[in-house]
Amino acid sequence: MPNMKPLLEDAKRRVDRRLSASRQSISSSRIFSSAFPDRLKDDHDAQVDYTAPPRGAGSRDGQLPYMHQSIFSMIAAVGSKSDFHARFDESSDSEGEAEGQTQKQPGKASLSNKKKFPLSPTLKPQSTLEGRGRRHRRSISDNKLLRSLKPSPKSSKGTETTVQTEPPTSDEMSPLASPRRARSATPRAAPILSRMLEAEALLDKKQSADQPSSSTKGETDGTSEQSCASPLSLRLKEMFGFEMPEKVLMEYACSLLQNILLQGYMYVTEGHICFYAYLPRKSAVTIRSGYLHKRGRKNPKYNRYWFSLKGDVLSYYTDPSSLYFPSGHVDLRYGISASLTEQKDKDKEVRDFQVTTDQRTYYFRADSSASAKEWVKALQKVIFRAHNEGDSVKISFPIESIIDIEESPITDLAETFKIRVVESDESYAIDEYYFSFFESGRDAYNFVKGLISEGPMKTSQLLPPPSEQTSPATRARGPRNRWSLNSDLSQSRGNGIFKTQRKRSASTGQTNSGPDGIGMSPRQRDLSDSFVNSFEQATDASAVLQSMIDTTESASQILNRSDVFQSPTIHTLRQRHPSGDRTGRRLSDGTARSTHPNAADANRNGQEMQYASSDSDQGTQHPSKVNSSAPTLNELVKAGAYPLQRAAGFAEYLRSRSRQMSNLLASESMGYIEKVSGMWAGGRRHYGETEGVLPDDQDVDPEDKEDGVKHGDRFRAHFALPSTERLQATYYAYLHRVLPLYGKIYISQKKLCFRSLIPGTRTKLILPLKDIENVEKEKGFRFGYQGLVIIIRGHEELFFEFNTADARDDCAVTVHQSLESMRFLVESGLLAEQEKDEIESAQAEHRMLQEARLDGAGEHDSHASVNESSELHPIFDDPRASIINFKPSESLRITCLTIGSRGDVQPYIALCKGLLAEGHKPKIATHAEFEPWVRQHGIDFAPVDGDPAELMRICVENGMFTYSFLKEASTKFRGWIDDLLSSAWASCQDSDLLIESPSAMAGIHIAEALRIPYFRAFTMPWSRTRAYPHAFAVPENKMGGAYNYITYVMFDTVFWKAIAGQVNRWRKKQLGLKATTLDKMQPNKVPFLYNYSPSVVAPPLDYPDWIRITGYWFLSEGGNWTPPTDLLDFIHRARSDGKKIVYIGFGSIVVSDPSALTRTVVESVLKADVRCILSKGWSDRLGDPASAKVEIPLPPEIFQIQAAPHDWLFSQIDAAAHHGGAGTTGASLRAGVPTIVKPFFGDQFFFGTRVEDLGVGICMKKLNVSVFSRALWEATHSERMIVKARELGAQIRSENGVDTAIQAIYRDLEYAKTLARQRSIVSSTPFSPTPSAKTTAEQEEDDVDDSEEWTFVGDDTEIDVSRRLRDRAVSDADMLPEPVTSAS
């Protein structure tokens, strides 16, 4: 990683920002680096709103609520008191997945973070900067190539399979080793086999020291040989570590056959058979997701969860919409195998499968046999990639080691043969390699068989001399299947490559873990033995692991676990002494014993120096590092600050004064009290690049002097994160869901995490920073607490509470800084610089090999005809079905029904133009005044009654679809609604598909009567979700998911109650349908198309599949518009003067004093020193008659226009200020300019909030000179806002909303047809236009209980359970089955 500025300066800068952080009224999302000019400070009119409506009309703010307010004002005032979907991620005790429930069996080597593993001084220090976790480090370059591990002095050269490691560097030879090595730091280095790593490193060091002359001679000989070797021979020598170039005899394109099919090349040289496959790294995307049943650790009951396989982690959730709150995870970096469970009944389909890791076996059950097989295949691929996390796979074995070759006919598509290779001099293990050839398989078989017959392997070469005793440190092997990955060899051998744990690549050396093959005896062992069995016996390594028990439990460890108090607080580390009688002992059960005296001494010294790694978050001082200075007054005050700390402080005083007392007191037990009190006291911490606590944060918790590296390791272990994830800051806070939950916030480079610390809770939060839109500071829910709101893409807000405003502000600033540092970094597309270097080096190696192959094509026959693939193909997988073309074979007559203003009709024109291009026959049914506009685009038209001007008057006076709006419409304008329904029915005849704006109210009933598929489309959120409030019920402050969801329920209920009487009469009279209810209609099951950008309103996680956010349906008309000359001159003059240009236009709004609003706009423009293009549309039609109506003259800085296409105009300006309508907002955001929104009614408040949450603009609550001028200046000068708006504009312009909507229509058409048939069967009568075939008696029976006739099977969270129980009691139990719901 690139170096940051000095940590001290960074910390001071952070403190300064912390002190200056806001308790201001504006959102902290707009932290602006530059101060506002003095002229933009608040003036006397700072609290005045010149857009206030006429007196008596009501206003959003206090006495004058805006017109759109309704019953939701009461909801907003009361707030959210309940959470409909409480998602405490608790599970039964039998699940046992919490960190604190790791079993401690005496004979079992647990790999929890409470164990420490000693490292030899000869090993490279495994610091967190170098322990890469998921991706091991590679060094493939011209000056640091792969080298083979030298054999023991007495072994036969050339009779062993190549083992590749990196030569130890100067750092690796350092006598200092890292005192900490948590599992998460180097997950690929199997902790249980770390001793083997030491043995091989010690051997390599010793041999390098003993044989310098021979090494030099070999290099000289190799140089002379290279002069006459081919480029391919030289390249293979470098890649596979041969001692000298070997002539390439033959080359074939083939595939290595195991549980996966890996395509690559086989190279047959004079002395070796090599296999190479290029395996590019895949991006972190979700590989597979879906529902599975999981069995608990102790409870045999299966519970249903939503599973997601992403990267190396299999996570599961109680609710698929809560993807940031996992119930648990399986870290596949430690996976051993994934396989179907064997059934006693062979005829029965297997739905169960299991995943074995180094700690336990997980049992799962899929819904079908096919699903189980697909999951197993996906898991096998991930385990393979996790264990071979490189960019290439290499295998090399000497021809002399080949025992035999035989054909293995597996499939008719390819010829397959098996090569059996003896392992080495030290063991009689036999490796088996399967190679499949799609071409030239017979030639390859005959050629290799000829080589074997010419030089059969001598038996004497396999047997060591009788007097020779091979050191166990010389070789550590598994049963078979060696995998060499770039610079670090990764081995995976056993009964299939997934049946045993393989070697995992660390930053140096290698580890190997064969369960039954380390030092294989001649007697073949049962290959079905599981790797887990090797943990059952108390081997030396397991004894060391068991002895390294952590005694530095932290506060979070204490509160999170109760078994901490059940173990001794003081443990003696058992010392291992070298023993001569162990020198020749064979290694078994997957444990390597180091017998080298130096290694034993190093291990012993390392043990004396080390702590044990714990699963905690805060540590204590080492007993040997007691502060001996006299206690200061501050220390005494701190000791008495908290009740629990008084005893701890007194004990520390005695411990530092008396050696005898120090021996008598259980120091660690007192540490428990200190840490619990410290944890409840809260606080915060910042960490540097090495994850050490920054100096300015040491005072937060003085008794914690631990090395900060441990914090990062525990953080990564808690959340199964890679070692590249660096911890930056931690905070103690409350997470508010249903109840406040105390825990710890972790902020790293790419994640914001939370872990509960309350006993009995297991809530975890893993939130990628790229999904955070904004952070806002609010007052806490409880008195004396400070609130912080995290706004997430497509998810409800998260609320945190802090004890102090200082900690809250610091957390907000830290999150903002993290967001800025990676705002435009896409996780799946951009990698770290180190990862880029590794990928480039692997690609360079692959490219050079290809070039060498081409250069040497004349020296040998090349049969490489199979295209290379980076995919890991499953064996015998069903061929992937081709993409189904959902487009109907015949042209459809499609009617689009909408009412409202021009902005409501324009998106449908764009959609219909796309449908015309697809060969369909679209028609728009709307108000008659839009007919010329619609027909000029070649679209058919049908009139719908209702004056849009009258409709706008109702909206302006009462608010859009508020209770007063519906009340007036149903009383004074009852005839208007009747005419609307009747005219809509007539306009929709002769249609095959109906697409309607739900504001038209009639479409769902018309489609039911005509039995045609029905879609909805709208410009604002209308479907129930917890992520956003209803567009007509946006609160002043964030209210949370419960409030958001209830706004939709309340709106649907109120909206339907207001029109239900008229609609049902219309249904019976004209449509011939029975009366209906909201439950029978089930509008939330209707396919929905939202015509706004997913970049602006991200799809909520709880949206079902039939709701799609397609992107804006723009109608570009600017190409045919010629701008006036004076407008072009105005723009040119502004650019020449170096002035910013803004557009101001609030549409046809109604204000009490239009002159005052005009004067405010003029003064704000002059005060902000910008140029303005003004579209003045406000009027005083409903204004105060006493208000002045004198026209305000416009200065030269303002140019007034009547109309201009948004797509042309917004491309000429630097910022736009408007009312926040859906279409206007989309146009300004597409242009990539900062947007200022002053909402008035309807959905304008929603889009104004979205603009501010995205950081691309400002939403003004009031409009006056002070506020507006400052907003204009910030929108034109804030580089942060300008860049964000530019990036968002690029995203929107890259979308094709119309095309996406058409494809969504095709895909959901069959689903919509199914809904239409179900509805018509339930509600049709003999008088229906399309009557059903039911008899009169059947119709009468349906009249009683038709509400459950077609209840959906699945997660029906929208329908209340009590209602279903009530309806079920009324229904005839003998006729109707009970409604089925999901188990989840």
Curated annotation (Swiss-Prot):
Residues 1-64, 86-189, 204-229, 457-526, 560-629, 1322-1350 are annotated as: Disordered. It is a peripheral membrane protein. It is an enzyme of class 2 (transferase). Keywords: Autophagy, Cytoplasm, Glycosyltransferase, Lipid biosynthesis, Lipid metabolism, Membrane, Protein transport, Repeat, Steroid biosynthesis, Steroid metabolism, Sterol biosynthesis, Sterol metabolism, Transferase, Transport. Residues 237-284, 714-817 form the GRAM domain. Residues 1338-1350 have a biased composition (Acidic residues). It comes from the Eukaryota. Its EC number is 2.4.1.-, 2.4.1.173. Belongs to the glycosyltransferase 28 family. This is Sterol 3-beta-glucosyltransferase. It comes from Aspergillus oryzae (strain ATCC 42149 / RIB 40). The lineage of its organism: Eukaryota, Fungi, Dikarya, Ascomycota, Pezizomycotina.
